[in-house]
């Protein structure tokens, strides 16, 4: 009953592949959307605040997002690996590889760019930040823009890969 000319097994593999692709697109889209909203929505609004409320808001955002972003990334990466392994070297394989590369760029920027700055930022006193706090924030924002576009381009490659399949 498990194998009727291979069609039941083949249908199950196809279903699992479709679910993996859906989950991968979903989580990659959530990651890209979250990055876009933070980068071009929240960040631009935060900068108009005075020093104390700006730093307090940044502290709150860092604390909230430091659990959410890794969870979204892990789900994106795991579903991507599943979809890629089930897809094999099909039509969208190269695009999935480019998407994975963009996701790796996102990770490198996060680990070596934004996380150290966020860690330092949490130590700032809102009423007495370091004298160069605005310079540090501009550096953080450059990393944030690069991260955002790495996530968005990764998502675009995944959409194209699914479209080719």
Residue ranges of each PLM-predicted region?
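Short, strongly hydrophobic alpha-helical membrane anchors
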Residues: 1-18
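Interfacial segments of alpha-helical transmembrane regions
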Residues: 14-29, 89-104
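Interfacial loop at the N-terminal end of multi-pass membrane proteins
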Residues: 17-22, 28-75, 122-137
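Membrane-helix exit/interface motif
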Residues: 40-41, 73, 77-90, 113
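Core segments of transmembrane alpha-helices
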Residues: 70-83, 147-156
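Mid-bilayer segments of alpha-helical transmembrane spans in multi-pass integral membrane proteins
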Residues: 104-112
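Membrane-proximal soluble regions of multi-pass membrane proteins
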Residues: 134-142, 147
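Juxtamembrane boundary at the C-terminal end of a transmembrane helix
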Residues: 159-165
